[in-house]
Structures are given as structure tokens and as C-alpha cells.
């Protein structure tokens, strides 16, 4: 039998904010998901989907009242078999596309320590800063570099993100006997203790008691679960949480990152997480689970290969989930892409294609360039290995480290002479995939791309950006037509910077990017940089402020609904009324939520004859409107009447439709034709005939058609 499923989601912003579309994506599986937990642990029944996807972040009372409804069961994502133990092999891929040079310290050591042909495209080395603000870099255990105590991250990032960020590193882990929650010490495996100890050395937030508790709960939930290489699944959970910590996520988000697969892959339920960690964490984990389910559905239907539908899917996904759940899903996908080698070549291609078309654009829409670059380069490596290797070698051979070092010294002296202080002056390199895409799009050779080599300068304020630009143009010849003022005219995702291309020694083009600290924060971390941002401390253009607030409001729609009837949750977790747009109080949950009143359009996923399409409907569309568009010949039942037998009726959020005028809302799930076993066809033949007769009667003038009995 034909099964048609519809998922309706709004894509437009609230009327008072910027209407620029955003993108996101995720993983959906409507088949049964098996659990590989210990046999001694009974599996909790899945919670039903009530109100469709719009109930992802509904109140606990709503969730409880819906327990009698039917639910989808989910299936294991192929990524559950991935592993992560080759940190040395992957360290070159874990960096962003920018890196720095020190005139003396790393001239000889860079090539010796980084033999990978693509290391020059990903690995930061050293930065030059004007006294007394010169910064040192310390190497993390995960292969990335972090600025020192007086550096960029501990300076403007903490100021921008407030208590949401903790970039301090601590070497002292919390002792077991200091914890306030009970822990089965004897049952904890040695590898888990070591994993936590190493995580605590990499980031201080893993010393937080709630994070430690989540770690041990994740260990218990995934105990015995292994990836394809037989490495513990817990390692993936830790790496996902570490990625979140490294972009400034607070303990709530890191805890949810550790637990992100527990609902799908273990005995844990939403209620279990709610009791142990509160509604905030439980909602995030459930949100990630639903995003994974949707992405699975899109992947199975090859939506990523359909440009228009993929773009609609990005926008639709952005409108359905808490931003923090979106970031957790992105971190999950980024780590899975780093360990994609564990899958078969066919699956590698499929996941890389989906990541390139869905997840990388999502990271771009949210402005998280560090993740976008890594995702794109990893996809490039798996989708086009020959081109990847060829370009890596070509760029390694053509890379002129001495030229970059000389340019840094020259600009440093000129800035000092002009009295312009700065925070960072470093070399940067365009990413492999970005170069490849530009060559294809504009039909250029590598020699014709002017922004492969470059410098990045971070100054105090907007005025200094333009002063520094004048200094740059006084040192080198400007390439006509290559000046781009993204400060006055920001990109759609809020990116701001000055870009210019100059000729060094008349032969080698050199791109120079100039921005403020706040602009750099926006460029690197995008939406994530503004979870707790105080707008009063930064002079952003009104456009960028709109984009920041739009990201806050668009990522979920349920703010006002969540503020009602949360009697089962402690007062500390209760939802306050949303602040007036666009400002928010420090702890206002509305900083993650959009206005709940949306006025269209509605994006709808329609699955029919095992094919999925993403369609757009006007606001206030009804089930009848959807059926009219589908047409009478597209399914087995008549659009003019609905049978009395509930088994044959279309279903809205698992409930048989009783009124065709029901409006499609954000996240509604509509099954146009339930699957009927062949042995039941005889039983329903009479009912199907009545449906057909009703359709004929409807076509006669003046005939009213009811439900029939």
C-alpha cells in the first residue's frame, strides 16, 4: 500500500525581524531502532509524537498527557558503528583554515612537524601581536591550538559570551569522594576513568560536577556498545562534547552533548534524563534525537541531491529546533566525518554527500566558519580523493612561507609606526575545498585565484579597520576591483570584515582581512558566539543585530507554549515570559526561541510511493489544501470524503483526521494513506467502495459530503 507522510514546518521569521532564510539539517529513521544495552536493563517505552515536531520542546506536562498516543520507532544510524582512535592521523583535519606565522620560531619547525600535504591549509602555528598584547599558543591534546591566558579567547570571547564560556584549562580533576551524586565506583571501567581524565586536561569544563555526572551516565548507557573498530562508543560522546566546549558551550550544552545518543541507543528515556538533569538537558537530548531522525529520512530519500528541496530543508530544520540542539547535532556530524574511514566506501560517499549539501551549509548559515571549513574539507577528501590529493600536493609545493613571514614583519612595523594597536596579526590560507569550488565555479586555474595566501589582522575598533586598510594599501599595490567592505555591507550570516587583495613583489597576490575582535568572534563562531552576548558592549550594524536575534528566535517556535503549565518542573527551570524583541535578559530562555506566531509559508515533506519531496504551502493551509495539491490520482483514498473506519483515514500526528479543515502547523506529521496488510483488503473493500461513491457524489452540484458511517 502507498504510504504518504507529511511534515509541515514554517520557514519565515517573525514579522519584526530579518527574513533572510537560514538552513539546517538532521538524520530520520521511521524503522525500528535496536538497542545494544545490557540485557539486564529493561527498555523504556518510547514517548509518542504529539503535535508532530512542534512537541519537540513542549512542556513536561504536555509530554505526560500525550503518553497514550502512538509513536514512531527509530532505527540505528550507520554512524553508530564509527570509531575514533586515530587522533594523530586526523589532527590535520581538526583545524580551521587559518594559521599564523612567527618570523623566527617556527620557520624551520613547521615543515618538519607537519608532513601532511594539507597541513598548511589547516594548522595554526603562531601569531604576531602588538606589544604588550603578544600572545603565545599552547597545543591541546586534541591537536588544536588555543590562545594563552592573556590571549584572544580568554579576552574577548569570555567577555562576549559571559558565563556561557569557559576557556580556562585546569589540570586538577574533581575527586570521586568530592562528588555530591552517588556513583557506582566499582563498576566503572579503567578506560572510562582514563577517558575522563584526559578530557579534563583538554578542557576545564569537564571538571564541572554536572558534566562528570553526565559522563558516568553516558558510560552506563553505552556500556558494552562498540564502534566498527571495537572502540568504545563513549569515546564518540566525549569528542562530541569536546567540540562543543571548544566553541564556548556552557555545562548544559556539554552535558547534552555527552548524552546526545542515549534516547536512541540505550535504556534512557526523556523522563530519566529529566529526573537526573532537568528539563533543559532533557529537551536538548530529545531535540537532537528528532533531528537525527529527520536527517535519516532525508538521506534515505537522497534529498541532498535536489538543490531546491535541500535549501527548503535547511530553512525548515532551522525553524524547528533549539539552536543548542542544532549545534550538538553539528558537533556529532563533525566528529563522525572525522572518523568516516570506519564505514564502507559506499556509505562514506553517501554521508559525505549529505554532509556537504546539508550540514556544511547549515554551519555556514549559523556563521560557524571553523566547523564549516572542516566539514567541507572532510567531504572533499571522501567525495573527490584524487582531486583532493592533487590539490594538496600542488598547494604544498607552491606555498611560500618566507613570503608570509616577511609580509607579517613588514605590516607589523608599519602599524606600529602609524600608532595602530592590534590583537592578532597572522598568516592564513584558503581552505582546500574553497579553492576547488572557486576553480570550478569561475573556471579558474590555481594561479588565477588571488586569495589563497593571506594575512588576518584583528584590531580594536571599526575605525582602526579602515586606518589599517590605508596602511596596507600604502605598503603594497592594490589589485583593482578586489576590495570588499563587508563591514558596511555584511554577508547574510552576519559576517563582517574588510577584504583587500594586494600584490607582494609584483608577482604574488596576497589577501588581507581586517576586522575587530567582535567581528572575528562572529566570523568564527557565528550564532554560537551570541548565546549570552551583551549588545551594549559591541557596535554592530542593525543588520547584524537583526541576524543575531533572528537566529535566536528562529531555531524553535515553542517559547510561549513552554511557559505554560510546567508544574512538574522545579521553579528554577520554569520558563519566563519572552522578552520584547530584540533584547533579552541574561538568563531568558527566549534567547534560543523564536516568536511562536508565524505567518508562513509552510514547508512540507511529502512521502508518497516511497519518494520524498519538500513542498511549500501558504500560511494557514489545511489538510484539504494538501490533498487538493496531491490530486485524486495520487493515493488510494478519495480527497472528497474520509472513511468511517479509522484505519483508512489520514492521520495527523498519529491521530485519525476528523476534519479536513485542520490547519497544518509547524511540525505536523500527516500520513495520507496508512499501510494496510494484504490480508485485510477484503475487509475494507466495502469501505473503499463507499469512499469512491462519495467522491462521485461530491462532484454533483449541491451535494454535501459527510463522514458517513
From Swiss-Prot:
It comes from the Eukaryota. It is found in: Plastid, Chloroplast. Residues 233-337 form the HD domain. Keywords: ATP-binding, Chloroplast, GTP-binding, Kinase, Nucleotide-binding, Plastid, Stress response, Transferase, Transit peptide. Residues 1-63 form a transit peptide. It catalyses: GTP + ATP = guanosine 3'-diphosphate 5'-triphosphate + AMP. This is Probable GTP diphosphokinase RSH2, chloroplastic. It comes from Arabidopsis thaliana.
